[in-house]
Amino acid sequence: MFFFPKLRKLIGSTVIDHDTKNSSGKEEIMSNSRLALVIINHAFDKVLSLTWHCGILSEIRSGLMLMFGIFQLMCSLGVIVLLLPIIILDAIDLFLYMCRLLDYGCKLFHYNRSSLPVADGKEKTSGPISGKEEIVIDEEIINMLNESSESLINHTTAGLEYDISSGSVNKSRRLNSTSTVTFVKQNKLVNERREDAYYEEEDDDFLSNPNYDKISLIEKSFTSRFEVACEQKAA
């Protein structure tokens, strides 16, 4: 870049020296030589400006590339910072799922070992309830249901008297009220004789029955016993 100005000064000084030595020379040759030197000087100026502008362009290009690299790096860091919590949460969830899977595998292995038959007549301390025990518990629940239903029917029908002549049922003095009750007959042959099946009330409100407290107590006791039996079955 500094070579062209020095060359231009050297050419100009030689031309001036030549003009002073040959002052009596031909003017056409001198004018042509001067014109050539001026053209060369302008060419050098253009080359210098071109190289200068190319250098500026290269510097601008390198600066823009540096700025673009910094911007790209900042964008990458921003994306990493934004995605880092999600990545950490996914890693924690994956770790918890793996721990849960290992826990389930250990439980399954322990269950399979406990369900295997034990030799030398040793009883198992843990394991599922056998089918025989389940059947026994089911029978207990069924018997409890039958007993509670029979006691409930006996309390609800307590105090009802059947009048043979009128074919209706009246309440006794314990209920302190009388109401018409339809007596439904079902003919069943039991030991070659007819028996009457059940009563059905029509005009009586269930809540006005004095035996309602007894019935509710029976239901509560039945519910509690049924829950206890179900807990024993599930244990």
From Swiss-Prot:
It comes from the Eukaryota. The modification Phosphoserine is found at S177. Its main location: other. It is a single-pass membrane protein. The keyword Transmembrane helix applies. GO terms for biological process: lipid catabolic process. It is found in: Lipid droplet; Membrane. The chain crosses the membrane at residues 68-88. Keywords: Lipid droplet, Membrane, Phosphoprotein, Transmembrane, Transmembrane helix. GO terms for cellular component: lipid droplet; membrane. Present with 922 molecules/cell in log phase SD medium. This is Bypass of stop codon protein 2. It comes from Saccharomyces cerevisiae (strain ATCC 204508 / S288c).
